[in-house]
Amino acid sequence: MYKINPNDLNLTDKVVHISRVAKVVKGGRRFSFSALVVVGDGNGCVGYGLGKANEVPEAIRKGVEQAKKNLIKVPIVEGHTIPYEVLGHFGAGRVLIKPASAGTGVIAGGAARAVFEAAGLHNVLSKCLGSNNPHNVVKAAFNGLAQLRSPEEIMARRGVTE
């Protein structure tokens, strides 16, 4: 898969999950934050990143920078959905993603919905199977979207002209 230059795209970011973690030290608890962020151009390019810092805005900024380094291209058919059904895996999390007819909308749970909206998918059905942890769901959704190939790409690979 080729590298996508984030500077050429008009990316929007969406915070999926913010987590506060504590390190226990002699004087008490030391708090830190991690932010799971999804970025996308709404036209087939989408990425995710995890930022960690002592303050929330800094964690989000780091997450966005990480997400820009992790962009994938999603094939969108008929201007609104994916070409075929796919199952993405990550850890114990699995996400089933199905194409939907026009007017259906994005039917997905919180973390997966953010990924599909950032990618520019307007009609898609999805179901989280197994783990509902936002990190696993986002990574499983990405795994599923990364497996997708456009109909033209599949025809070229098989040597079919029409």
Swiss-Prot record:
Family matches, as SUPFAM superfamilies: dsRNA-binding domain-like, Ribosomal protein S5 domain 2-like
Keyword flag Ribosomal protein: yes
Pfam families, sorted: Ribosomal_S5, Ribosomal_S5_C
Record-level GO BP terms: translation
Sorted UniProt keywords: Ribonucleoprotein, Ribosomal protein, RNA-binding, rRNA-binding
Domain S5 DRBM: start-end pairs: 11-74
HAMAP family: Ribosomal_uS5_B
Function per UniProt: With S4 and S12 plays an important role in translational accuracy.
Quaternary structure and interacting proteins, as annotated: Part of the 30S ribosomal subunit. Contacts proteins S4 and S8.
Domain-related comment: The N-terminal domain interacts with the head of the 30S subunit; the C-terminal domain interacts with the body and contacts protein S4. The interaction surface between S4 and S5 is involved in control of translational fidelity.
Protein name: Small ribosomal subunit protein uS5
UniProt organism field: Geobacter sulfurreducens (strain ATCC 51573 / DSM 12127 / PCA)
